[in-house]
Structure formats: C-alpha cells, structure tokens
Amino acid sequence: MALDTEKIIEELKGASILELNDLVKAIEDEFDVTAAAPVAAAGAAGAAEAKSSFDVELTEAGQEKVKVIKVVRDITGLGLKDSKDLVDGAPKNVKEGVSEDEANDIKAKLEEVGATVTLK
C-alpha cells in the first residue's frame, strides 16, 4: 500500500481544527511520540555561548607574598589586613564578575609577582 502524500494533505485541508487536533493526539498515542519541539536543544545552544564575566581566583601566593598582597590591595581597594587575609586564605576570588580583558589584566599583574591565578 503506497501512501500518496499529496492526497493525504488534500484530505487534511478539508478537516476542521478539532479534527486535526484529534488526529495529532491519535498519532501521538499510536506511535508513542510527541509533537512538542525538543527543549534540550535550546539549553545546548546556550552552553556554547561565549562567557561574558569572569571570576579571578588567587590559587596560590607563591614566594613573594608581600608583593602579591600589594597587588591585591591595588586591584581590590581593600586595606592591608583584608588583603593579607585574602592572600593567606588562597584559593580565594580576588575579583568577581569582571570582563575578560579586565580578568586577563588582573591575572597578568598577579602572575608578574609570582602568584598562581585561575580564571573561572
């Protein structure tokens, strides 16, 4: 039995919306499928987008802790004690939600004085 797609479409053109809705439901039940568009595809596309904000994490202070504390003070505007606590408590975020350029700039400044930095 060959199906003629054009004949089927012509028959469907004469059907009412209610009849077409019943037909869709019957096809879904018979073949165990759904007429809904897949939602997972939208999530996958969102994951591929470029990241717009970064967190700069001080992973390790390195050998020149005093220099790292000075750079952290300059970057964050924190006081000496707070900057020292941040460096001593590594790994900790130095800055959060910054642009890629700013994150790379901060990373370069910290690495220049011997710190290990991770961008997240």
UniProtKB/Swiss-Prot annotation:
Superkingdom: Bacteria
GO molecular function, one term: structural constituent of ribosome
GO terms (BP aspect): translation
CDD domains referenced in this protein's UniProt entry, alphabetically: Ribosomal_L7_L12
Keywords: Ribonucleoprotein, Ribosomal protein
Cellular component, GO, one term: cytosolic large ribosomal subunit
Pfam families (UniProt xref): Ribosomal_L12 (PF00542), Ribosomal_L12_N (PF16320)
Function: Forms part of the ribosomal stalk which helps the ribosome interact with GTP-bound translation factors. Is thus essential for accurate translation.
Family to which this protein belongs: Belongs to the bacterial ribosomal protein bL12 family.
Subunit structure: Homodimer. Part of the ribosomal stalk of the 50S ribosomal subunit. Forms a multimeric L10(L12)X complex, where L10 forms an elongated spine to which 2 to 4 L12 dimers bind in a sequential fashion. Binds GTP-bound translation factors.
Protein name: Large ribosomal subunit protein bL12
Organism from which the protein derives: Lactobacillus acidophilus (strain ATCC 700396 / NCK56 / N2 / NCFM)
